[in-house]
UniProtKB/Swiss-Prot annotation, chain B:
The keyword Membrane applies. The record marks 5, 117 as: Interaction with the K-D-E-L motif on target proteins. It is a multi-pass membrane protein. It comes from the Eukaryota. Belongs to the ERD2 family. Its main location: Golgi. Residues 47-48, 159-169 are annotated as: Interaction with the K-D-E-L motif on target proteins. The chain crosses the membrane at residues 5-24, 33-52, 59-79, 93-110, 117-135, 150-168, 179-199. This is ER lumen protein-retaining receptor 1-B. The record marks 193 as: Important for recycling of cargo proteins with the sequence motif K-D-E-L from the Golgi to the endoplasmic reticulum. It comes from Xenopus laevis.
């Protein structure tokens, strides 16, 4: 799945 | 946090500090594109609005605050404190050619059609091309100070390291963010020519200069 919504990077 | 991501962040932080120190110690921003720095300030501002909505870790929050604060400090030094040394005549890249298309694209291709998410997407797209005014300035003047080359290398290698981080995360966490990955690839490709010059010239003790 595309889980790009977890923006835990800088 | 894997080693590639950590080294990427450290290299990004180093780039920012190298630039701040270069300008502050020499009291001059000669050879630095104010436009690229302005774009980076916009990138950090639009990406880190989640500082107010979302807590990830102490590390994450502190890095974001440092990135935002230092980008504003750099812009202030170029356009105010050391304005007289700013080489605006050579900083002629039209930033609207970067801001307008990336803004449109962020409305069209995003993970979620919400204000914060669109701004995050815009910042990812804009970051991938924000260095172009600086690279344009180097190609226009045909040279860059060695310290400026170190800055550009640290800044370029940061996103390259993130590409390895994304491979790692896909492999071990089944995590991937296609928007960040594609933009990161574009960003890295833009630096390739510079990486080549950096390795063949600057690392051998020569100044980075382009053939006329």
């Amino acid at each position: 799945s595309v889980n790009g919504l977890k923006h835990d990077e800088l | 946090m894997n080693i590639f991501r950590f080294l990427g962040d450290i290299s990004h932080l180093s780039a920012i500090i190298i630039l701040l120190l270069k300008i502050w110690k020499s009291r001059s921003c000669a050879g630095i594109s104010g436009k690229s720095q302005l774009l980076f300030a916009i990138v950090f501002t639009t990406r880190y609005l989640d500082l107010f909505t979302n807590f990830i870790s102490f590390y994450n929050t502190s890095m974001k605050v440092v990135y935002v604060a230092s980008s504003y400090a750099t812009v202030w030094m170029i356009y105010s404190k050391f304005k007289a040394t700013y080489d605006g005549n050579h900083d002629t890249f039209r930033v609207e050619f970067l801001i307008v298309p990336t803004a449109i694209l962020s409305f069209l291709v995003n993970h979620d059609f919400t204000p914060l998410e669109i701004l995050w997407t815009f910042s990812i797209y804009l970051e991938s091309v924000a260095i172009l005014p600086q690279l344009f300035m180097v190609s226009k003047t045909g040279e860059a100070e060695t310290i400026t080359s170190h800055y550009l290398f640290a800044l370029g290698i940061y996103r390259t390291l993130y590409l390895f981080n994304w491979i790692w995360r896909y492999q071990f966490e089944e995590f991937f963010d296609l928007i960040a990955i594609v933009a990161g690839l574009v960003q890295t490709v833009l630096y390739c020519d510079f990486f080549y010059l950096y390795i063949t010239k600057v690392l051998k003790g020569k100044k980075l200069s382009l053939p006329a």
